[in-house]
């Protein structure tokens, strides 16, 4: 959003099955984080929390929202994850992106296909090597402020979502450490890794911006 792109978030569930907080609290937290990130839109698909399915009904809902929002790029979960919803979300987003372009697919709106589906890799211990790492140094504190909005999920925690526990470091410290590690891979302070099915093109051999030495 800081670079002038129109950015939105589609939450697939309301978090009603979570151990902490409630769907109503999560909705308030999502609204605060949207303001922090400068989102153009934030919507909720209202699918079942902790029971997310990549079935015809769910694909129809997501296709309708893709056709409404008409994104150029979709960023979703890693294809592997410890939360079943996260694994399903990755494939659901991919399948819905394809189906959305089918003119006669039974869902609201006019056909539309995003150009890319990109998968987040942060915190996955079994992730493939990233296709690329984005320099988030200038926006890292905004990222942390957006995460902090979700107090019911993350406040006082050392593990949440895809972040495994096992040490005394706060969730904030673990996020900083992970992003600093990936930043070092591109010779920057902080970075975020992503993976795509397709090959990433470069203009020339030296255009990736990362020095060998």
State where each predicted segment sits:
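Active-site rim/loop-helix segments in enzyme catalytic domains that contact anionic ligands
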Residues: 1-69, 207-208
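Metal-dependent de-N-acetylase/amidase catalytic core
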Residues: 55-213
């Amino acid at each position: 959003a800081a670079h002038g792109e129109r950015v939105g978030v589609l939450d697939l569930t309301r978090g009603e099955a979570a151990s902490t907080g409630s769907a109503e609290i999560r909705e308030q937290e999502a609204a605060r984080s949207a303001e922090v990130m400068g989102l153009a839109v934030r919507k909720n698909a209202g699918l079942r929390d902790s029971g997310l399915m990549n079935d015809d009904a769910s694909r129809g809902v997501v296709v309708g929202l893709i056709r409404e929002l008409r994104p150029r790029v979709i960023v979703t979960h890693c294809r592997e994850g410890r939360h079943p919803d996260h694994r399903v979300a990755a494939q659901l987003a991919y399948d819905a992106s394809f189906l959305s372009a089918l003119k006669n697919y039974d869902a609201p709106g006019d056909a539309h296909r995003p150009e890319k589906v990109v998968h987040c890799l942060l915190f996955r211990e079994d992730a493939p090597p990233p296709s690329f790492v984005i320099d988030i140094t200038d926006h890292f504190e905004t990222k942390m402020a957006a995460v902090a909005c979700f107090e019911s999920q993350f406040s006082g925690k050392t593990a949440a979502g895809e972040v495994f526990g096992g040490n005394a470091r706060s969730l904030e410290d673990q996020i900083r450490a992970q992003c600093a590690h990936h930043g070092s891979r591109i010779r920057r302070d902080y970075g975020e890794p992503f993976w795509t099915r397709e090959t990433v093109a470069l203009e020339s051999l030296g255009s990736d911006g990362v020095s060998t030495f």
